[in-house]
Structures are given as structure tokens and as C-alpha cells.
């Protein structure tokens, strides 16, 4: 069976599970139409690096790969895309396995999976990236997680979504683009939220806020938005 066919079958299974609220898989799945819209706006280019710091089953990374794979026939660029361009993190071992399998069935990471089982908030990023696509988990940090205390963050907070936003802000290259799904509290919360929003507006071009319909996520009726921003800090 052709690899693309295997991959499509696997994606369909993941999507069906994502639509099943009783299975609990919905927390790992972002609707494909929303993923595609976020990729279309950020426009990743072959030769660039793409990261999802809360990658779930790898939908964003796979969509970015599909967007870039026909941009060039240059072997070096295609090898880079397949082996080095994509970076994903998730702190749940089962989900990392699902994501790795999902990408593998599309011919990505055949020698080494680009997905790491790691809480991406715990450490400063080792490298900066060109594009970030993410739908971080809503709610509080899992039981047993360490408190986030990072010198590269703008402010200390226990708000998981604000910490993910800070993490993405510090890991973008100059001129990098990000699209991230975040709940309403990120837009309206005072204190740490106000500080982070001020930094976002000062050092980045927050060009679009896309309001999502309530219930767009299969397992939760959370009011959410997509923030699209460019890194343009003065150097």
C-alpha cells in the first residue's frame, strides 16, 4: 500500500477519534479545516523550520509538511524538510507515539522521529524557529508538573496558556510567524496577562485575531481565538 494512502487512513482514524467526545481523544485533535487555515496564513517555506510545542498527534506538522513538500525539487531542500525542518513536543508518551506514527506513515522521520516526549515549557528553547503552529491544551498544568520559572519569560505566572504564549514569543526567529489557538482569558486577564499582551504588541506584529465559534473543538465548548503574529523585535 502506498505511504500516502496509509497516512491518509491513519489520519482518518485519528480524526474519527477526535470527533468522539467519549473517547477523550478530542483533547489531542484540532479540526483539519482550522489547521489548514492557520498553515495558509503563516505560509511556511521549504528550508524553514516549523515547531509545535504541544503537538498532540502531529496535525499541524503534517499540514505544514504537505504545504511545503512541492515547493522545490532540490534534493537538499527536500531532505531537510523530511529530516530536520519539523519539531514537535508533547508530554504524554502515548500521544508522542501516535504523532510519530502519523508522521512516519507520511515518510517523515523515518530515521529519527521529530517528536520528543517533553514538557516544552520547562526549558528555554535551544534553537529558534521560523514558524510556530499550535493549539496548547486548555486548563491547568497536569498534576506533578514542575512550576514554570524561566529567566527568558517576561513574567512569572501559573496560567498555562500565558506560559505557552510566552514560550512561543521567545522562540521565534526575527521575522518568524506564529499562529496559536488560545482561550479568551489570554486576551482579557489582568496582571501577568496584561504584561504579556503589552510585550506582544510592543515587540511583535499581532496582525490578526480570529474569533472561533463556540464548540469548534470536539471535546470542549471553550471560547477560543487564533492569534496570528510576526516577530519584529528591534535588533
Which role does the model predict for each range below?
Residues 16-19, 144-150:
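Gly-rich Lys/Arg/Thr-decorated short loops/hinges at beta-loop-alpha junctions or inter-strand turns
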Residues 1-18:
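Long recognition/docking surfaces used for binding and targeting
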Residues 172-178:
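Short glycine-dipeptide loop
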Residues 24-134, 139-141, 150, 158, ...:
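Conserved S-adenosyl-L-methionine
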Residues 218-235:
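Flexible, glycine-/basic-rich loop-and-beta segments that form/coincide
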Amino acid at each position: 500500500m502506498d505511504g500516502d494512502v496509509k497516512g491518509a487512513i491513519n489520519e482518518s482514524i485519528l480524526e474519527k477519534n477526535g470527533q468522539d467526545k467519549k473517547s477523550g481523544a478530542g483533547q489531542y485533535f484540532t479540526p483539519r479545516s482550522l489547521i489548514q487555515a492557520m498553515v495558509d496564513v503563516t505560509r511556511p517555506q521549504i528550508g524553514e523550520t516549523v515547531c509545535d510545542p504541544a503537538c498532540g498527534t502531529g496535525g499541524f506538522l503534517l499540514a505544514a509538511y504537505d504545504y511545503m513538500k512541492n515547493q522545490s525539487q532540490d534534493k537538499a531542500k527536500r531532505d531537510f524538510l523530511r529530516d530536520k525542518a519539523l519539531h514537535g513536543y508533547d508530554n504524554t508518551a502515548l500521544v508522542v507515539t501516535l504523532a510519530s506514527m502519523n508522521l512516519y506513515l507520511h515518510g517523515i522521520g523515518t530515521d529519527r522521529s521529530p517528536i520528543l516526549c517533553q514538557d516544552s515549557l520547562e526549558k528555554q528553547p535551544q534553537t529558534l524557529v521560523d514558524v510556530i503552529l499550535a493549539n496548547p491544551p486548555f486548563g491547568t498544568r497536569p498534576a506533578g508538573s514542575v512550576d514554570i520559572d524561566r529567566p527568558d519569560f517576561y513574567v512569572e505566572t501559573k496560567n498555562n496558556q500565558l506560559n505557552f504564549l510566552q514560550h512561543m514569543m521567545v522562540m521565534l526567529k526575527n521575522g518568524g510567524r506564529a499562529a496559536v489557538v488560545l482561550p479568551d482569558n489570554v486576551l482579557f486577564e489582568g496582571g501577568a496577562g496584561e504584561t504579556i499582551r503589552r510585550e506582544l504588541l510592543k515587540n511583535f506584529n499581532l496582525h490578526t485575531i480570529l474569533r472561533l465559534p463556540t464548540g469548534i473543538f470536539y471535546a470542549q465548548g471553550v471560547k477560543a481565538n487564533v492569534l496570528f503574529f510576526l516577530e519584529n523585535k528591534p535588533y
